[in-house]
């Protein structure tokens, strides 16, 4: 009789423990509905996962039933940073420079970087383009010589701005002037030959370039040539994470699903069509090439187009640390390291562990343009 009682107690404990696990796993789904506003850049490959989440409504799987998510598109990250600081957006998809800058607004609104959306060898945002009638350079180093004394343009405060500053410092190139121009103005000025060069990011590079685009500019070099990687991040307001850790984690579960979707070659055509549907002027062929196409070797192409670490690996940490130091040295920010608690992938690591997913999640090996499905 006593043995039966002990068995009953054990079974009761096991059942209680199992129910507890189910309850913990289902915390977000059992919570009250939420209204989220997400800032993303459909004109940037670091936000393609957000575009997938938006199009396929993946967030419905993890957020409480009845929740609503509003996606607000922006042409560059600084716009998203301003919206997050003003508490108009809780979540933002950012390139490396605006991501780092966002964390320095501690007196107004502390912002955390909570996950990585992509890490490339300078293939995404660190791209130097030259006007269409520039010489056909045999190597990026040859292009560097031509670029000295030329007129550059880039959107100030962007990840491309960071690379241009780094490029000038590393090569000693002295631009005639550096113009602060939007993506559209740069494209227009390339058409009428008002600028010699620009530093831009994908998919605008593919849109105006000679490989699948309009042909008003040519890729001359990338960050791969100068050992300067680029990355994308998910930023969240610190007060949002503190008040709603379950919702923040639920969003990262959704992000994991989206990144895994992008990594599957069977989905590449659909990803391109999704991006086309959330942009203007970007064709499916341009969207496909911007993340899955191979940049030629002679202008800085790398063996890997993009890596999806998701968490902050040593390589991601190195990029973050270097970005703080560099932006402080050129007086863009007033600190040379991350504020306490600003770089926090705790929830991302939990999500990866619970999904039993590898880190990195995967790598995109680019295909030649001739293999495009479009």
Regions picked out by a protein language model, each given a short descriptive name:
Residues 133-144, 292-308, 362-373:
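Charged, glycine/proline-rich intrinsically disordered loops and linkers
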